[in-house]
């Protein structure tokens, strides 16, 4: 296609909204003539399902739950007045709490103001707050923010080392809907120990974001934590960033959460349109459907040309892959749906995997994200007539053209600048696009049975570890190979898992397991040191 033809196609397909200061360009997705019209009946059904969801229909039948993350930025849409009041009062409580922390009215037990903020959570309880912190944070942050987002001991040690002596002035927010998420529980216990070793009272530094009556809620109440904020069962983790999960850390950091919500609300209003060309989320969903043949046949490569959007690909990985990656459709038919998402940032990626994108296997489509405003304040010229930002823009446009020359399709999303409002709009845009696409391919976007299966399997490993430790302690003078241990436990089918558990136990001194190494690693002998 000639450049003039591409320009005409660009004008024909471009969505631009002056209020949102956002554009969605699908001109480099090779929709055939009449594709939008052909898909309209299916989209109308998707719009109808989305409207029912917003009105309070049980959109997650597996868990018999409503799905209400859109109400978080428009409480008046909630199907019950009590829900609207809870949303409104929670936002007011978040802002009041953050103001009291910033003003020193809520302080550490020794009276010092809080200077640092440690967020403990995993999945959506960490990815959303991390994305907001990284995209909108800066030198004027009111609290320095840190994260425990895994159950990796060394990772937590690294964070605590970074906090250092400021631990005594660190506010801790523990986020878990059920209160029983093991990674989050482990992080909380590690933090408790760090505070105790420093001679500090953890409860005097702690805040919970959790479900009413959860294990974490009971702990916070019993120990008189500084505060508890709600997580409702009608908000999923991956769509919780505009709830207390994301708003409390952001407000404490000093981000304008009202503008964040306003941006999301404005985008929600635009993406309710049933006129597809006037609905940016629908255009995204159609792009995904065409690029992947509605079967996930291609990956989505996310290339934001902005360092502050580096974590957006990780945030979207969960939002898209956990929502769309399903083995069964809503009728119980096996479909193996999903779209794999990966990415980093431009122009860094031009020196990494863009080589394969242009010249290698064609199993992807690209989403470019362009931010027009380079920085706050003027830029120097790195050469006559050109700034660093000019180069970034040039590299974006050049990569887009170079890929399309080789038949690599792409979508480009453009925002004028990064702000709480534009980040809110991007979040809302993708939440809606995921919901619409899920309707197009007939999957439930609001459950995650595979995640639960992984948790159950992990629990089985820990149970087997307990059995191994019990046998080692009962027979302290006996050496076991992995195979011998599995047979002794009458679990021969678990020999590989048994071997891996023994290797890990011996590598760490916490459980008192020693190893005698042999030429063949699977013949290594393990015993209790006790």
Curated annotation (Swiss-Prot):
Function text: Catalyzes the reversible isomerization of glucose-6-phosphate to fructose-6-phosphate.
Gene3D superfamilies per record: Glucose-6-phosphate isomerase like protein, domain 1
GO annotation, cellular component aspect: cytosol
Source species, domain of life: Bacteria
Name of the top EC class for this enzyme: isomerase
Active-site residues from the entry: 322, 351, 455
Record Pfam families: PGI
UniProt entry tagged with the keyword Ribonucleoprotein: no
CDD domains: SIS_PGI_1, SIS_PGI_2
HAMAP family xrefs: G6P_isomerase (MF_00473)
The protein's annotated pathway: Carbohydrate biosynthesis; gluconeogenesis; Carbohydrate degradation; glycolysis; D-glyceraldehyde 3-phosphate and glycerone phosphate from D-glucose: step 2/4
Keywords: Cytoplasm, Gluconeogenesis, Glycolysis, Isomerase
Record's catalysed reaction(s): alpha-D-glucose 6-phosphate = beta-D-fructose 6-phosphate
Cellular compartments annotated: Cytoplasm
Gene label: pgi
A single GO BP: gluconeogenesis
The protein's Enzyme Commission number: 5.3.1.9
InterPro entries referenced in this protein's UniProt entry, alphabetically: G6P_Isomerase (IPR001672), Phosphoglucose_isomerase_CS (IPR018189), SIS_dom_sf (IPR046348), SIS_PGI_1 (IPR035476), SIS_PGI_2 (IPR035482)
Family label: Belongs to the GPI family.
Organism: Citrifermentans bemidjiense (strain ATCC BAA-1014 / DSM 16622 / JCM 12645 / Bem)
Molecular function as annotated in GO: carbohydrate derivative binding; glucose-6-phosphate isomerase activity; monosaccharide binding
The name this protein goes by in its record: Glucose-6-phosphate isomerase
